[in-house]
């Protein structure tokens, strides 16, 4: 294993805020910047040349007594990811070679929907080259996985179905800051979640 560390880049820092939402200023009047959070790590990920990357931030490092469980579940997640990735790569090779039967295209569509959890009603009606293009776009992209634990009231995001602009529905992790907590129905959905990341 090649284990390295990547620190968040200062260019992704965000302005610190006071409790009332106004920018926090240092004693000299300058703005205080702080690391921007998980989303800011995307830039770091783009710089990596690796098949599998585990992101572990300082707020989710576990004590030594729990490390064995952490290693076990990382191995499970990596095994699942590599297995899904191998199927996706095999399908991509077939799509690139061309001459894929409609039956095989629909098998690939089932994989995208059932195993990659990305559903589109519009895709169900696609055939031939349109379906091939749709599948290629869905398969030719990075894969993400996320460990989940029971929600016991700790802060964190949770698994939600995201309704995307293209009409597809995909499984996504949403943080509380991405949920309109002023909408009682959305707040209730977030609070009733059984698991979080």
What is the role of each PLM region?
Residues 1-152, 166, 178:
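Domain-scale recognition of functional cores that engage charged ligands
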Residues 185-197:
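Short nucleic-acid-contacting surface segments enriched for D/E, G, S/T with interspersed K/R
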């Amino acid at each position: 294993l090649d284990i390295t560390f990547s620190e968040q880049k200062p260019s992704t820092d965000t302005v610190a805020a006071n409790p009332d939402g106004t920018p926090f200023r240092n004693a000299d009047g300058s703005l205080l910047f702080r690391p921007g959070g998980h989303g800011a790590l995307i830039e770091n990920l783009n710089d990596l040349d690796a098949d599998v990357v585990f992101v572990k931030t300082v707020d989710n490092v576990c004590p030594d007594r729990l490390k064995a469980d952490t290693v076990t579940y990382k191995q499970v997640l990596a095994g699942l990811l590599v297995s899904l990735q191998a199927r996706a790569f095999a399908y991509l090779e077939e799509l690139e070679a061309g001459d894929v039967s409609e039956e095989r295209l629909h098998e690939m569509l089932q994989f995208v929907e059932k195993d990659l959890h990305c559903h589109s009603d519009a895709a169900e009606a696609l055939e031939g080259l349109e379906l091939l293009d749709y599948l290629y776009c869905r398969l030719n992209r990075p894969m993400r996985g996320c460990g989940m634990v029971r929600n016991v009231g700790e802060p964190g995001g949770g698994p939600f179905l995201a309704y995307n602009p293209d009409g597809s529905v995909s499984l996504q992790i949403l943080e509380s800051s991405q949920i309109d907590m002023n909408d009682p129905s959305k707040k209730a959905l977030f609070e009733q979640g059984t698991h979080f990341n």
